[in-house]
Swiss-Prot record:
Keywords annotated in UniProt: Cytoplasm, Methyltransferase, S-adenosyl-L-methionine, Transferase, tRNA processing
GO biological process assignments: methylation; tRNA processing
GO cellular component, one term: cytoplasm
Organism: Klebsiella pneumoniae subsp. pneumoniae (strain ATCC 700721 / MGH 78578)
EC number: 2.1.1.223
Organismal lineage: Bacteria, Pseudomonadati, Pseudomonadota, Gammaproteobacteria, Enterobacterales
Reactions listed under catalytic activity: adenosine(37) in tRNA1(Val) + S-adenosyl-L-methionine = N(6)-methyladenosine(37) in tRNA1(Val) + S-adenosyl-L-homocysteine + H(+)
Protein name stated in the entry: tRNA1(Val) (adenine(37)-N6)-methyltransferase
Length: 245
């Protein structure tokens, strides 16, 4: 999975079918986002909304995973990140299916009256603390501009009755997010706890909520096997994306 085998661009991350430049974005491409983009359920999806799109990674991954009739919209508050996400989308094979909006999700409205079968977000999760080097990075890391209650409210305004709202969070913050979501009328439908190996405790959790009640399916994913190779589960989930897998 190393990118060192070939002379690849250094200002971003090269996947099998697209490139994500992220040098103008506060938060870079990482495993959390890749897991979320590969994991989110897509059955019956016709419209996707990516909240807090950053470089556009999730929008691009969902465009790759879905059919030509699926429209993906990405909303990003930061002007530089939104511009780079738009450039990444335009350079991809799915330029005609991805729209990037530079806007505050609290005020944003879709260009057409519609709701989304899938809403996805890799949200900030740090409470305000030690200042970051730039205000752009503070916005991406801290919940001051997009707290979790507001995120849940915004998702509720845009989702279909049978739709899924998917996030990735640290386990402890994810558990608190679940309780907040339930108090606001959401139902947890899918949960995958992610650990580095089978012997280590989970450090991230992938969550899918719906306005509609139903059975909750839970499982666990180890990224690496006993010999530190990528596990079968991780490989099966991400091999359509990682360049050297």
């Amino acid at each position: 999975m190393s990118q060192s085998k070939f002379a690849l661009p250094r200002n971003g991350f090269t996947f099998k079918r697209f490139f994500v430049a992220h040098d103008r974005c506060a938060m870079k491409v990482g495993t959390d986002g890749i897991l979320l983009g590969a994991w989110a359920p897509i059955a019956g999806v016709k419209h996707v909304l990516d909240i807090g799109a950053g470089s556009g990674l999730l929008a691009l991954m969902l465009a790759q995973r879905t059919g030509d009739d699926v429209h993906v919209e990405a909303v990003e508050l930061d002007e530089e990140a939104a511009a780079q996400a738009r450039e990444n989308a335009l350079a991809s094979p799915w330029a005609s299916r991805i729209e990037v909006w530079q806007a505050d999700i609290h005020q944003w409205q879709p260009s057409q009256t519609r709701r989304y079968e899938l809403i996805i977000s890799n949200p900030p999760f740090f409470a305000e603390g030690v200042p970051c080097a730039t205000s752009q990075r503070e916005q991406a890391r801290y919940t001051t501009t997009l707290d979790h209650a507001s995120l849940l409210t915004c998702a509720a305004e845009h989702i279909t009755e049978e739709g899924f709202f998917c996030v990735v969070l640290p386990v402890d913050i994810g558990n608190a997010f679940i309780e907040r979501a339930r108090a606001m009328g959401w139902h947890l439908r899918l949960r995958t706890d992610v650990a580095e190996t089978e012997l280590r405790p989970p450090h991230r959790v992938l969550l899918a909520f719906s306005p509609t009640a139903g059975e909750c399916f839970s499982d666990r994913l180890a990224i690496r096997g006993p010999e530190q190779q990528y596990s079968e589960g991780f490989t099966a989930l991400t091999e359509d994306f990682y360049l050297f897998m």
